[in-house]
A protein has these predicted regions:
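A short, N-terminal "cap"/entry segment at the start of jelly-roll beta-barrel domains
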Residues: 1-27
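N-terminal regulatory/effector-sensing and dimerization cores
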Residues: 25-121, 152, 158
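Amphipathic alpha-helical segments enriched in hydrophobic/aromatic residues interleaved with Lys/Arg
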Residues: 115-172
Length: 180
């Protein structure tokens, strides 16, 4: 898919104050982050839900509530809103490329209700999907389409965002059921 159409940031430095701000002028944001010189983030949390898909370079190490998660290229990690975490981006390579999807809590909750997923266990904790299921269900293409949907007129964009987030939620829920 056309990753070049996703907004790209190189060595972006995130502050705790920036992380605590909600999404501005959108309910969903997709960005492509490359870290080379800036190889770690501050400990932070967000008022929105965040998914990270490493697409090239290094494995990423996330520290969350005393636990360590190694997220390899092709895997997907989900952070519920308000979860404190920090990342180190150069574990086994000198750079890291990641697609980062940020979803406003109001949009998240509306999609969860509409898809009748109020009891989906994965939504309440850190969740990591392996590269095989990420490739099978082509999450990278879904996330690139989400980024491209920013170009739609506002009223249409919100409807498309709801459809895309609902699709993602249903797929992750089904993947969880298949692996139980």
């Amino acid at each position: 898919m056309e990753i070049e159409r996703v907004t790209h940031y190189v060595d972006n430095v995130l502050t705790q104050a920036e992380a605590r701000m909600g999404l501005r002028n959108t309910r969903l944001l997709v960005a492509w982050y490359t870290n080379q010189k800036n190889d770690q983030s501050v400990v932070h949390s967000h008022p929105y839900h965040e998914l990270v898909l490493p697409i090239g370079g290094s494995t990423v190490r996330y520290s969350i509530d005393g636990s360590v998660y190694l997220v390899h290229v092709g895997e997907l990690i989900y952070f519920p809103a308000q979860i404190y975490h920090a990342g180190i981006f150069n574990i086994d390579n000198d750079h890291s490329d990641r697609l980062v999807i940020q979803i406003d809590d109001a949009l998240w909750q509306a999609c969860r209700r509409n898809a009748n997923l109020k009891n989906a266990a994965w939504m309440h904790s850190i969740t990591v999907l392996d590269p095989d299921v990420c490739n099978k269900w082509d999450f990278q293409s879904l996330f690139v389409r989400m980024a491209q949907s920013q170009e739609l007129p506002a009223q249409m964009r919100d409807i498309v965002f709801e459809a895309q987030v609902s699709e993602m939620m249903l797929l992750i829920t089904q993947i969880g059921r298949a692996h139980v």
